């Protein structure tokens, strides 16, 4: 006789850190599954109120009162030039990206004769991917695409040389803290908390869906061959909980 309560148990997938990989035929380095890890971080920022508040607060603390110098009185001309290059809005955005994304990028714009730097602008970090490093292990450029989630092989990419590697009028200064084992990108310092941010988001969605469904049950189990005895019902209920109530 076939066991009516024969159920299979499925373990849910576990959390993994972002994958950084070189793909044959591509000059840039992918970051995360589907090359879209920066968007994953943005989604966790938008979906978790706790994560959102922490990132906003810490980025404001990094910014503080803006960019300053301890020797501004001794070098007033250099200080004035620095303040002219780094406007407050640019610095604030860099601090925000540094906390949210773990890194940030600056567009370095030179004069026509390339005698000096005339402007520094924030570059949204999620629009950049690192070029494969040279034989010396140096990254010589970055590739720009407005939305990497829509990138397809054959789409035109804009290559921007890394700061100090070319004679072009525009370069990218890529700022990232050192992380052991990561050459191209730096994981965020809250890497271990991203799954909790996602968990908070999913719990919110779960309760919202319950409200939108009028608090109706989300699962109904029907036994076509009669009602099992209490012991069998308890075993079936326990197995259903094991299968659907979260990762182990």
What residues fall within each predicted segment?
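Structured, contiguous alpha/beta core segments that scaffold functional sites
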Residues: 1-248
């Amino acid at each position: 006789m076939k066991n009516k309560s024969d159920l299979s148990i499925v373990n849910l997938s576990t959390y993994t850190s972002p994958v950084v990989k070189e793909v044959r035929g591509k000059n840039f380095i992918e970051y995360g599954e589907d090359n879209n890890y920066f968007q994953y971080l943005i989604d966790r920022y938008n979906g978790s109120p706790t994560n959102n508040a922490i990132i906003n607060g810490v980025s404001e603390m990094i910014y503080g009162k803006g960019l300053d110098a301890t020797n501004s009185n001794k070098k007033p001309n250099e200080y004035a030039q620095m303040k002219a290059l780094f406007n407050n809005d640019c610095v604030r955005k860099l601090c925000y990206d540094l906390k949210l994304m773990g890194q940030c990028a600056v567009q370095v714009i030179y004069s026509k004769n390339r005698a000096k730097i005339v402007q520094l602008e924030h570059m949204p970090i999620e629009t950049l991917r690192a070029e494969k490093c040279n034989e010396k292990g140096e990254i010589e450029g970055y590739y720009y695409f407005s939305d990497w989630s829509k990138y397809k092989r054959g789409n035109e990419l804009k290559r921007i040389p890394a700061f100090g590697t070319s004679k072009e009028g525009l370069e990218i200064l890529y700022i990232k803290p050192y992380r052991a084992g990561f050459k191209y990108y730096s994981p965020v310092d809250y890497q271990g908390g991203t799954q909790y941010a996602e968990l908070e988001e999913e719990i919110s969605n779960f309760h919202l869906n319950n409200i939108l469904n009028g608090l109706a049950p989300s699962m109904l189990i029907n036994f076509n061959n009669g009602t099992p005895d209490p012991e069998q019902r308890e075993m079936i209920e326990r197995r259903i909980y094991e299968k659907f109530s979260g990762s182990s």
